Amino acid sequence: MPFLEQPKNLDGSMAGDVGFDPLGLSEIDDLGIDLYWLREAELKHGRVAMLAATGVIWVEGFGPLPGWPEADGRSQMDVFWDAWEEHPNAICAGIVFITAIELISGVATTMGRKTGERAPGDFGLNPLQFEITEELALKEIKHGRLAMWAVMGQIGA
């Protein structure tokens, strides 16, 4: 924004950094929250939102996975409890899996921040050996930001 002062931490060195921070979040350095932590959170939430937006579109277009209940105009929580009754082990396994991912990513984030040897969002998972470029990093940030807005719209609709 032309009338706002550009924050000192947003110097354009990160993908998607255009110096826009009207709330001054990039200047926070208390309680373990710094620019590294904020970028890690933005990437994580963007990735989850991209998956969520795709999942919503999939269910709307093709219906639920075989063996799982259909919403049929009911609230999604009613559908969740129906699924819980039919597939409690699958849901518990999903919760355990998500917990493990959160623990692993939390340790990686904390260690990467302390050592400086790990870029935010980099878990070393690249089985197809894609070349990581600045262009791809920018696309991931932009698509993640758009997906976060899209999921909010899908939930609100």
Predicted ranges, named:
Residues 1-157:
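Alpha-helical transmembrane segments and their helix-helix packing motifs
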